[in-house]
Amino acid sequence: MIITISGTAGSGKSSVAKALSKKLDYKHYSMGDFQREIAKAKGLSIVQLGELEKTDPSIDKMVDDKQINLGKTQDNFVIDSRLSAHFIPNSFKIFLDADINVRAKRITKVREAESYADVQKAIDASIKREKTNQERFIEYYEF
């Protein structure tokens, strides 16, 4: 069985995916971690990578292809990604969301590489990231 966990930034996708994969003894994949690795390799923040993705579709393609390949070649795993349910249609799908203030607090607490001066800065960055993602999703995937 393949379980896809989608949701908003800071909603707990990775935490739930890790706990579920441990409970089921499944492999865990995180496309958010994969994107953070790409950002780090390019010397960018995750927000800056999102801005770059607006004009460079090769980054999204790399992430999309990774998910598609996992869905076609592996079984018994949990993956957290905003679009994993789309790219792995034969999966059990979970969507998570939380209040923006809760999400911002989680982001400021959990992700050292994305450190923000305060919760409001995390809220602003989350809103900007979601807006950037939504614009790309409409352009690239028509949803």
Q: Can you name each region flagged by the protein language model?
A:
Residues 13:
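Conserved lysine of the Walker
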Residues 89-111, 117-127:
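Conserved phosphate-donor/acceptor-positioning beta-strand/loop module used by diverse small-molecule
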Residues 8:
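P-loop (Walker A) phosphate-binding loop of NTP-binding proteins
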Residues 116-143:
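Small-molecule kinase domains that catalyze NTP-dependent phosphoryl transfer to phosphate-bearing small molecules
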Residues 16:
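Hydrophobic positions on the alpha1 helix immediately C-terminal to the Walker A/P-loop
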Residues 5:
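Hydrophobic anchor at the beta1->P-loop junction of P-loop NTPases
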Residues 22-63:
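Conserved substrate/cofactor phosphate-moiety recognition/catalytic segment
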Residues 55-100:
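Glycine-rich phosphate-binding loop used to anchor ATP phosphates in small-molecule kinases
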